[in-house]
């Protein structure tokens, strides 16, 4: 397949036109690496390589754009790319490429998520839910939660702001339910309420 034209469309972006009038969007890096120029003939293997490398380069550029806005897990990035129409295989390849270079760090990202929600006063259950929602594998959850410092002041502050009468069973029940929704276990809730001389009915 003959390359008939190469046109720059924006900084670092090019369009390569083939003799069958197909136009392939690509990057300057791909054109340079594959030594493409008008008049060059590509065999079937060369054309497939060009198309593959172009897709991957464009996917990688979009991934870096997303990562420049905020940190993401590997799965989260893959999903965002495929949701935007990028090929699933290219998205997985790109995420792996970025992870190998330390630009995606699931362990570090998971630890940051855990610290963030712990600091906001959420319990382990809510943190697990957030880790799952962000594509962090279950195999990391316990390690991340074990590393997060336990801070009883958060749950105590929540109780002190809501519980005005430890003897009021209805109030204790509502506070307990709210803490459970925030991700605390019944064991943690019971222990915290004991510090306020309140108990949960079995």
Question: Where is each model-derived feature located?
Answer:
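An alpha-helical, amphipathic repeat domain used for nucleic-acid recognition
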Residues: 1-202
């Amino acid at each position: 397949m003959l390359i008939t034209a190469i046109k720059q469309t924006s900084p670092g972006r090019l369009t390569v036109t083939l003799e069958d009038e197909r136009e392939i969007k690509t990057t300057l890096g791909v054109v340079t690496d594959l030594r493409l120029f008008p008049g060059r003939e590509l065999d079937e293997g060369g054309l497939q390589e060009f198309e593959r490398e172009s897709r991957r380069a464009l996917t990688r550029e979009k991934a870096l754009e997303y990562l420049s806005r905020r940190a993401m897990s590997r799965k989260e990035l893959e999903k965002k790319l495929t949701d935007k129409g990028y090929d699933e295989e290219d998205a997985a390849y790109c995420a792996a490429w970025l992870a190998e270079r330390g630009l995606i760090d699931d362990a570090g990202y998971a630890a940051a998520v855990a610290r963030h929600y712990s600091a906001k006063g959420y319990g382990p259950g809510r943190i697990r839910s957030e880790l799952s929602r962000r594509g962090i594998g279950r195999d990391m959850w316990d390690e991340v939660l074990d590393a997060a410092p336990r801070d009883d002041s958060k749950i105590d502050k929540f109780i002190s702001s809501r519980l005005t009468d430890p003897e009021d069973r209805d109030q204790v029940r509502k506070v307990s339910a709210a803490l459970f929704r925030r991700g605390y276990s019944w064991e943690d809730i019971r222990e915290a309420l004991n510090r306020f001389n309140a108990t949960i009915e079995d």
